[in-house]
């Protein structure tokens, strides 16, 4: 089997069409690190991951250092066929740094698929190539939020993810306007990004129950580390509670499951450190009947392709993969068709189908 003979990193910056605002950050661009792995047979594999410092702690320069100085000595001269053991050894060298791990994990999967002349989705076992995403609505005034939701509905999205948690009074006031303005055919997801406390979350749920909104989930209402609060809210709520920032890896998933601290887990490759750990989370959740969704950071279309490939292989249908709506279509037209709200992975890709 071929050996890894070179590893390089680079930085890419992708402008957004509009500013993305959550309870924890605001940005008008995507920063990411690209990994290029070279095999001795000439094949190259690419992986990419975002530097979402406010959530994962990763920085661009830190990711490059971890990959080039800590992971590379383990990776170089390794056999591609030993990728699982190689990545395990490399990742044991450093705690956290999940985005750096994601970029490397994806580059290995890209190479594995290219060696077989198939797409990563097919390598992972996907039987189809279409997944539906919601669209995220940034934090803003009630009027701005309503207008942005209307824009999303006009763009054919049927599921709307409303960012909350930055201003609780606005969050409460918003509910009446949503109930007045939108058809019950529109499904809503509310994501507080850790911005509420227990009492605020309960108040929000009680207020929600006064209306007839079609609400699917409430995501990560409180701080990621407050598992007891997540448990109390999950027990209280008649709406499914999703653990997002509370679950990075399989150990985190085991904890929230044991504590009955959620009804669903949001798997993100930038949290899990790539596909291999994401598969472990999904397997664990399946074993106890906890459903999973897939999400993402505000990240590159290449990262969205990787997550969509994983989701399709795992049979996950609840997806929050809308950065495609925030960037220019020509950035991903070689490997994805985005017919809002459907993400369609193109046929006959070799590996992921992207390069940098």
Swiss-Prot record:
Reaction(s) the record says it catalyses: L-alanyl-L-glutamate = L-alanyl-D-glutamate
GO biological process: cell wall organization; peptide metabolic process
Protein name, per record: L-Ala-D/L-Glu epimerase
Cofactor, free-text remark: Binds 1 Mg(2+) ion per subunit.
EC number in record: 5.1.1.20
InterPro entries per UniProt: Dipeptide_epimerase (IPR034603), Enolase-like_C_sf (IPR036849), Enolase-like_N (IPR029017), Enolase_C-like (IPR029065), Mandelate_racemase_C (IPR013342), Mandelate_racemase_N_dom (IPR013341)
Organism: Francisella tularensis subsp. novicida (strain U112)
Cofactor: Mg(2+)
Binding of Mg(2+), residues: 191, 219, 244
